């Protein structure tokens, strides 16, 4: 389930109206939600962008164009439901009647919620409060943290434990990653308690200033010398697994880990340039790997995409048509990126008025009553689930069936307004899971709830593409390269894109679950049966959007969301929720969401019809108030189910599936040859942007572990990465470089320069080539080096090569080297130049 708080809606309070809050991410807090990726566009022509946006059938043919389908911790859960060998399931009605004791109240609305901490799993709101309380209970119950409760040291240890917990570490135990890494010799001993204190201290140290590189020596400063071994262990683990010193701060981007001293670094191909692929590629490059990213679309980001919308009179806005709301910034790695990039965050305000079809606000008392009833229905389902497990009965039934049966048993929402309000909450739940409630597993649909990140939900001004472009900067990405098959064996991996093949030691597949379900990529040998079954069992759902840029904000500046009710339960998910992005997008932007069954029907409609329907709903709300709803100057309609690079929006736990399937999808195949990342491989944070991000970090660490194991056992000659004959590699690389330098960006004397593609920043890197002449005029030696764009321009302005060589040596301390001696950063630069050149050939 998406970790965005979509199951419940805060009560609208008059005193909250008019508030506007912009939040900066606090020291230990970071962000994410995952929705979808590419879009179809509804655009008026230049003459119609002012006020005459016509939606008549005749004009729609002229003024509407569609986008092409280019393509998007372990903290122990409170209760883990394990699948059991069970007898055939009973009908839901029979199970519910058996589960109701004589003491059960038939009045679901007036029943008081139990405060017993040992009661069955509560509903979404109570579940969050209880888990937060449990954090403190764990700390107080742990001798390692309660020894000095009244001292400043004790308080600091407690504070650091909470920061580590927000990142996903349990308070008094190790994560599975730490156990696999053998961070302590004895599980549960004194060393473990001390290690945890040291680990938490290092995390808190770096989180206090995420723009700096935390050194091992700095971590040692406040820890006694006898614990140096623990510091080394914790520091190495946190560094290599991406819990510290990660992100986009300049000092961090420039840092390089010495992971392969004395041996040739392994070669990794990353399939997909979504968040998971970008994060993994950047992390692997920093570790010293040779990396190439293959992306089928003509842009990075995958299901995270921001589109610039514009109209007449200079009206424009940035619209997130994919991942949009940053859900919970506490401990979220995207929050770290926001701090490093100096990005302010806009808190999504809790006010969410719900409008009846006639434009009137829903009755506040009825609204509150039904919201409470909805939460208690979920509580009942949780209690039923627990009792069925205890009685060894099958719980493999649809969530929607159980909710509807309970609704009938307790007589919830019997009049029309109550039913409309309940349907809105059910649509909201379908939004959270990107599917119909009838597809969700009652047993495991909310298996990720114990891991939800706390903190505010936020928008980022300018859209989430800011993260994407910053992560993709200077990465060697080949766009327009759709992977068709992956062959793997004991000697490496072959990745095929059309008529091209890429040889590598290891490959990381980050494509969405929908692509795996569709079988768009063939694997040779076939994926293990267990993995193929998990791919089929897990659900991959659909959410769509209509983004509309208006000439003015007619809905008001005091709210970020509002909803609309419908009398027809079958259309409850059709434009049921609107997000206002006026405060962060740069213009009057409104986004309507389409969830559940409506999201599937939406893809059968034309963009024109969809926009007409949204406008009909908006005018039904605002015209009775005397507010004119103008035509939008531009609109975008998503089509995620039809996108061949995603085939849907995000994952969910379907009937017959469980959280175990996320873990199975995350498993590598071929004895550490092909790895998998993406939100659908993250059991704790599926269906979120931060889940995709963390999965990329996880797999970078796994690839490093396997590479070290392979190097130490000499299973593969580290100098034989791609091709058997080293001479052939050198000759091919020389030919590639000659082709690149046929059209240099600058040339002067014996010097040629190639700038970083798509960047005119003075400090962006440039590849410098110098020809050293030999005795014969026709012969010579090419040497290479890296300089900034500004330095290259300064070189060109100098008088003669002698001064230029002196400038390189004396001022820059640079000695050009042969191609084979070029640094890892230089290799990455060459890969970026190749990718850019290939893209120009494909798209120009």
Swiss-Prot record:
<dbReference type="InterPro" id="IPR036388">
    <property type="entry name" value="WH-like_DNA-bd_sf"/>
</dbReference>
<feature type="region of interest" description="Disordered">
    <location>
        <begin position="1"/>
        <end position="131"/>
    </location>
</feature>
<feature type="binding site">
    <location>
        <position position="303"/>
    </location>
    <ligand>
        <name>FAD</name>
    </ligand>
</feature>
<dbReference type="InterPro" id="IPR007526">
    <property type="entry name" value="SWIRM"/>
</dbReference>
<feature type="binding site">
    <location>
        <position position="679"/>
    </location>
    <ligand>
        <name>FAD</name>
    </ligand>
</feature>
<feature type="domain" description="SWIRM">
    <location>
        <begin position="154"/>
        <end position="255"/>
    </location>
</feature>
<dbReference type="GO" id="GO:0006325">
    <property type="term" value="P:chromatin organization"/>
</dbReference>
<dbReference type="GO" id="GO:0005634">
    <property type="term" value="C:nucleus"/>
</dbReference>
<comment type="similarity">
    <text>Belongs to the flavin monoamine oxidase family.</text>
</comment>
<dbReference type="GO" id="GO:0045892">
    <property type="term" value="P:negative regulation of DNA-templated transcription"/>
</dbReference>
<dbReference type="InterPro" id="IPR050281">
    <property type="entry name" value="Flavin_monoamine_oxidase"/>
</dbReference>
<keyword id="KW-0285">Flavoprotein</keyword>
<protein>
    <recommendedName>
        <fullName>Lysine-specific histone demethylase 1 homolog 1</fullName>
        <ecNumber>1.-.-.-</ecNumber>
    </recommendedName>
</protein>
<comment type="function">
    <text>Probable histone demethylase that reduces the levels of histone H3 'Lys-4' methylation in chromatin of the floral repressor FLOWERING LOCUS C (FLC) and the sporophytically silenced floral repressor FWA. Seems to act in partial redundancy with FLOWERING LOCUS D (FLD) to repress FLC expression. Required for cytosine methylation of FWA. Controls primary seed dormancy by regulating DOG1 and abscisic acid signaling-related genes. In association with OTU6/OTLD1, involved in transcriptional gene repression via histone deubiquitination and demethylation.</text>
</comment>
<keyword id="KW-0804">Transcription</keyword>
<keyword id="KW-0539">Nucleus</keyword>
<feature type="compositionally biased region" description="Polar residues">
    <location>
        <begin position="107"/>
        <end position="118"/>
    </location>
</feature>
<dbReference type="InterPro" id="IPR002937">
    <property type="entry name" value="Amino_oxidase"/>
</dbReference>
<comment type="subunit">
    <text>Interacts with CZS. Interacts with OTU6/OTLD1.</text>
</comment>
<keyword id="KW-0156">Chromatin regulator</keyword>
<dbReference type="InterPro" id="IPR009057">
    <property type="entry name" value="Homeodomain-like_sf"/>
</dbReference>
<dbReference type="Pfam" id="PF04433">
    <property type="entry name" value="SWIRM"/>
</dbReference>
<feature type="short sequence motif" description="Nuclear localization signal">
    <location>
        <begin position="516"/>
        <end position="523"/>
    </location>
</feature>
<keyword id="KW-0805">Transcription regulation</keyword>
<dbReference type="GO" id="GO:0016491">
    <property type="term" value="F:oxidoreductase activity"/>
</dbReference>
<feature type="compositionally biased region" description="Basic and acidic residues">
    <location>
        <begin position="1"/>
        <end position="18"/>
    </location>
</feature>
<keyword id="KW-0963">Cytoplasm</keyword>
<feature type="compositionally biased region" description="Acidic residues">
    <location>
        <begin position="26"/>
        <end position="40"/>
    </location>
</feature>
<keyword id="KW-0560">Oxidoreductase</keyword>
<dbReference type="GO" id="GO:0005737">
    <property type="term" value="C:cytoplasm"/>
</dbReference>
<dbReference type="Pfam" id="PF01593">
    <property type="entry name" value="Amino_oxidase"/>
</dbReference>
<dbReference type="GO" id="GO:0048364">
    <property type="term" value="P:root development"/>
</dbReference>
<keyword id="KW-0274">FAD</keyword>
<dbReference type="InterPro" id="IPR036188">
    <property type="entry name" value="FAD/NAD-bd_sf"/>
</dbReference>
<feature type="compositionally biased region" description="Polar residues">
    <location>
        <begin position="46"/>
        <end position="62"/>
    </location>
</feature>
<feature type="binding site">
    <location>
        <position position="295"/>
    </location>
    <ligand>
        <name>FAD</name>
    </ligand>
</feature>
<feature type="binding site">
    <location>
        <position position="297"/>
    </location>
    <ligand>
        <name>FAD</name>
    </ligand>
</feature>
<keyword id="KW-0678">Repressor</keyword>
């Amino acid at each position: 389930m998406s970790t965005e708080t979509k199951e419940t809606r805060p009560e609208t309070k008059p005193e909250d109206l008019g508030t506007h809050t912009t939040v900066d991410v606090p020291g230990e807090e970071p962000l994410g939600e995952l929705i979808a990726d590419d879009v179809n566009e509804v655009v008026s022509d230049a003459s119609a962008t002012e006020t005459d946006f016509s939606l008549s059938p005749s004009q729609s043919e002229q003024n509407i164009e569609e986008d092409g389908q280019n393509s998007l911790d372990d903290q122990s859960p409170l209760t883990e439901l394990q699948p059991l060998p069970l007898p055939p399931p009973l009908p839901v009605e029979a199970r519910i009647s058996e589960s109701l004791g004589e003491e059960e109240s038939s009045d679901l609305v007036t029943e008081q919620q139990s405060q017993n901490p040992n009661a069955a799993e509560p509903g979404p709101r109570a579940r969050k409060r209880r888990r937060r309380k449990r954090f403190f209970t764990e700390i107080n119950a742990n001798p390692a943290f309660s020894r000095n409760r009244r001292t400043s040291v004790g308080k600091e240890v407690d504070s650091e434990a909470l920061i580590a917990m927000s990142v996903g570490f349990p308070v008094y135990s190790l994560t599975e990653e730490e156990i696999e890494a053998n961070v302590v010799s004895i599980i549960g001993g004194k060393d473990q308690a001390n290690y945890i204190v040291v680990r938490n201290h290092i995390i808190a140290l770096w989180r206090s200033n995420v723009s700096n590189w935390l050194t091992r020596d700095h971590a040692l400063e406040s820890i006694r010398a006898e614990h140096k071994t623990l510091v080394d262990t914790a520091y190495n683990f946190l560094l290599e697994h991406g819990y510290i010193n990660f992100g986009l701060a300049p000092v961090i981007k420039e840092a390089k880990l010495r992971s392969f001293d004395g041996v040739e670094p392994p070669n990794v191909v990353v399939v997909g340039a979504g968040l998971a692929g970008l994060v993994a590629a950047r992390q692997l490059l920093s570790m010293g790997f040779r990396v190439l990213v293959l992306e089928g679309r003509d842009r990075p980001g995958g299901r995270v995409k921001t589109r610039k919308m514009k109209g007449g009179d200079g009206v424009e806005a940035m619209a997130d048509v994919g991942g949009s709301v940053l859900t919970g910034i506490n401990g979220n790695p995207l929050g770290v990126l926001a701090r490093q990039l100096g990005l302010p965050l806009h808190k999504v305000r809790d006010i969410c008025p719900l409008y009846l079809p006639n434009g009137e606000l829903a009755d506040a008392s009825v609204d509150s009553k039904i919201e409470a009833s909805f939460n208690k229905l979920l509580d009942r389902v949780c209690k039923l689930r627990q009792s069925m497990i205890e009685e060894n009965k099958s719980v493999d039934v649809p969530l929607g069936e159980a909710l509807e049966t309970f609704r009938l048993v307790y007589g919830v929402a019997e009049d029309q307004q109550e039913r409309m309000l309940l349907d809105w909450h059910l649509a909201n739940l379908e939004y959270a899971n990107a599917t119909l409630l009838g597809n969700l597993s009652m047993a495991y649909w909310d298996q990720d709830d114990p891991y939800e990140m706390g903190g505010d939900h936020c928008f980022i001004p300018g859209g989430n593409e800011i993260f994407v472009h910053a992560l993709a900067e200077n990465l060697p990405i080949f766009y327009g390269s759709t992977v068709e098959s992956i062959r793997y064996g004991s000697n490496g991996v072959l990745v095929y894109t059309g008529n091209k093949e890429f040889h590598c030691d290891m490959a990381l597949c980050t494509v969405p679950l929908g692509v795996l379900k569709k079988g768009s990529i063939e694997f040779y040998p076939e994926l293990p049966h267990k993995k193929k079954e998990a791919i089929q069992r897990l659900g991959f759902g659909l959410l769509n959007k209509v983004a509309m840029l208006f000439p003015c904000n007619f809905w008001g500046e005091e709210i970020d969301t509002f909803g609309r009710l419908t009398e027809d339960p079958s259309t409850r998910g059709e434009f049921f929720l609107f997000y206002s992005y006026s405060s962060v997008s740069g213009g009057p932007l409104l986004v309507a969401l389409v969830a559940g069954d409506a999201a599937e029907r939406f893809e059968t409609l034309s963009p024109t019809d969809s926009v007409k329907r949204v406008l009909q709903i908006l005018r039904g709300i605002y015209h009775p108030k005397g507010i004119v709803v103008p035509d939008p100057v531009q609109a975008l309609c998503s089509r995620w189910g039809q996108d061949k690079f995603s085939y849907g929006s995000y994952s969910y736990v379907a009937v017959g599936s469980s959280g175990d399937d996320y873990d199975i999808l995350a498993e590598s195949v071929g004895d550490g040859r092909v790895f998998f990342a993406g939100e659908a491989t993250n059991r704790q944070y599926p269906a979120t942007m931060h889940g995709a991000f963390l999965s990329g970090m996880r797999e970078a660490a796994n690839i490093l572990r396997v590479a070290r194991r392979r190097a130490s056992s000499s299973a593969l000659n580290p100098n034989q990465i791609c091709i058997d004959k080293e001479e052939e590699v050198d000759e091919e690389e020389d030919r590639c470089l000659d082709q690149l330098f046929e059209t240099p960006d600058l040339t002067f004397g014996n010097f040629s320069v190639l700038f970083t593609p798509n960047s005119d920043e003075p400090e962006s890197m440039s590849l410098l080539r110098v020809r050293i002449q030999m005795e014969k005029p026709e012969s010579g030696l090419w040497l290479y080096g890296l300089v900034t764009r500004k330095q290259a321009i300064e070189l060109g302005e100098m008088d003669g090569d002698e001064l230029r060589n002196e400038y390189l040596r004396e001022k820059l301390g640079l000695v050009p080297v042969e191609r084979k001696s070029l640094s890892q950063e230089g290799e990455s630069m060459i890969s970026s130049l190749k990718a850019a050149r290939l893209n120009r050939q494909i798209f120009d």
